[in-house]
Amino acid sequence: MSPQTETKASVGFKAGVKDYKLTYYTPEYETKDTDILAAFRVTPQPGVPPEEAGAAVAAESSTGTWTTVWTDGLTSLDRYKGRCYHIEPVAGEENQYIAYVAYPLDLFEEGSVTNMFTSIVGXVFGFKALRALRLEDLRIPPAYVKTFQGPPHGIQVERDKLNKXGRPLLGCTIKPKLGLSAKNYGRAVYECLRGGLDFTKDDENVNSQPFMRWRDRFLFCAEALFKAQAETGEIKGHYLNATAGTCEEMIKRAVFARELGVPIVMHDYLTGGFTANTSLAHYCRDNGLLLHIHRAMHAVIDRQKNHGIHFRVLAKALRMSGGDHIHAGTVVGKLEGERDITLGFVDLLRDDFIEKDRSRGIYFTQDWVSLPGVLPVASGGIHVWHMPALTEIFGDDSVLQFGGGTIGHPWGNAPGAVAGRVALEACVQARNEGRDLAREGNAIILEASKWSPELAAAC
């Protein structure tokens, strides 16, 4: 080997394995305004110190690998490495720690949620030194937020388009979700919209199956929507699910929806993927379509308390990728703690500036620098008796979705929709009069049912 090509160990490179914490655990580091900050819930394997576990997460999700490599000398590790800058034990849990990691902004492609997640959670979750790992929160710096388009329209533009103000919006998923022909499906849509709902919805798994192809469904739903609009004088929408097997097919369906003149389409953003979702969000902004987002598959990722990704992170990612509505749970009937946590990420979806508040699960102050907001959708097992609580908890900027609560009405879809609309209007009026919805909710619904036989039948 010639002297020019020989790599000499004496130059400063020393092969071999060394502890991650020697390089990647930096408690003296002061975070920069441009860093992406992550809070990981780390459960180390027995015998692994928390500092080593936290440093391992920082290393494996940035520049590190299991051994020292000579090519480290060709770049500036100090500039590009992730740093675990703080570790704290989780109160009430044995051998669980919150590890805070700072990533330099240069590690990420601009405007790509896909690249952000590939970097931060792509490889590290199978790491042997960890028994479990959960990404609890991310702080997205304004410099990175500004590289994203975000929601196609946002809350204010949606209200302007629909001409609906001063109350939550009402929706309903068409049931049975699978098996109806396109014409019968359209009929169910018409009945619900005619009765007083603002929106009806394709279920997340309604795409283009043999019993109902997407084009037929789009045509009959558009007919139902325009007929209900003509009868009621209100603007109506049906979330036409454009999710498909390829991005090209998805955009083709969105183009057809736009040509029909409908106001909104829908996407399953986790099963469809962030690349597809961002493409659709860009198309929707350019062509005046609202975009409803369903979170099918989220529980696979976020249900375990010590492993996976918390939904607040998936919600932040959706706001960056783009969507005007997203399902956010209901909180009705759940534990108080879960209510606070849910309202924490509801604020992260809607508000422009959210202060750090650990009691609500918000680990970092988040500034969205005027990125449009997303309407949270409450759906799943709710009915008219829940209306006072939902109106109080979610406020006006929300979509309340009563699927079985509408279609399960003993008199049919249209009376079910009437019952929901009357209950909502009664709760909004009572709230505006200063009444306590939490205490007087049942009385408010019963009062309204005296002059609405449809609501009385639903009660």
From Swiss-Prot:
Site (Transition state stabilizer) residue list? K334
According to its UniProt record, the EC number is: 4.1.1.39
Query: Per UniProt, which keywords does this protein have?
Result: Acetylation, Calvin cycle, Carbon dioxide fixation, Chloroplast, Disulfide bond, Lyase, Magnesium, Metal-binding, Methylation, Monooxygenase, Oxidoreductase, Photorespiration, Photosynthesis, Plastid
Domain of life, per UniProt, equals Eukaryota
Location of N6,N6,N6-trimethyllysine modifications: K14
Quote the Pfam families the UniProt record gives.
Answer: RuBisCO_large (PF00016), RuBisCO_large_N (PF02788)
Record PTM N-acetylproline, positions in chain: P3
* Location of the active site: K175, H294
**Cofactor binding notes:** Binds 1 Mg(2+) ion per subunit.
Q: Where in the cell is it found?
A: Plastid, Chloroplast
Which top EC class is given? lyase
GO terms, biological process: photorespiration; reductive pentose-phosphate cycle
Question: Propeptide-annotated positions?
Answer: 1-2
The entry's cellular-component GO terms read:
chloroplast
PTM characteristics:
The disulfide bond which can form in the large chain dimeric partners within the hexadecamer appears to be associated with oxidative stress and protein turnover.
Q: Which SUPFAM superfamilies match?
A: RuBisCo, C-terminal domain, RuBisCO, large subunit, small (N-terminal) domain
Please give the residue positions where the record annotates the modification N6-carboxylysine.
K201
Q: Where is Mg(2+) annotated to bind?
A: K201, D203, E204
Instruction: State the reactions this protein catalyses.
Output: 2 (2R)-3-phosphoglycerate + 2 H(+) = D-ribulose 1,5-bisphosphate + CO2 + H2O; D-ribulose 1,5-bisphosphate + O2 = 2-phosphoglycolate + (2R)-3-phosphoglycerate + 2 H(+)
InterPro entries reported in the protein's UniProt record: RuBisCO, RuBisCo_large_chain_AS, RuBisCO_lsu_C, RuBisCO_lsu_C_sf, RuBisCO_lsu_fd_N, RuBisCO_lsu_N_sf, RuBisCO_lsuI
Q: What assembly does the database describe for this protein? A: Heterohexadecamer of 8 large chains and 8 small chains; disulfide-linked. The disulfide link is formed within the large subunit homodimers.
Family affiliation: Belongs to the RuBisCO large chain family. Type I subfamily.
The record's section on PANTHER family has: RIBULOSE BISPHOSPHATE CARBOXYLASE, RIBULOSE BISPHOSPHATE CARBOXYLASE LARGE CHAIN
What's the protein name? Ribulose bisphosphate carboxylase large chain
Annotated source species:
Corynocarpus laevigatus
Q: What is the lineage of its organism?
A: Eukaryota, Viridiplantae, Streptophyta, Embryophyta, Tracheophyta
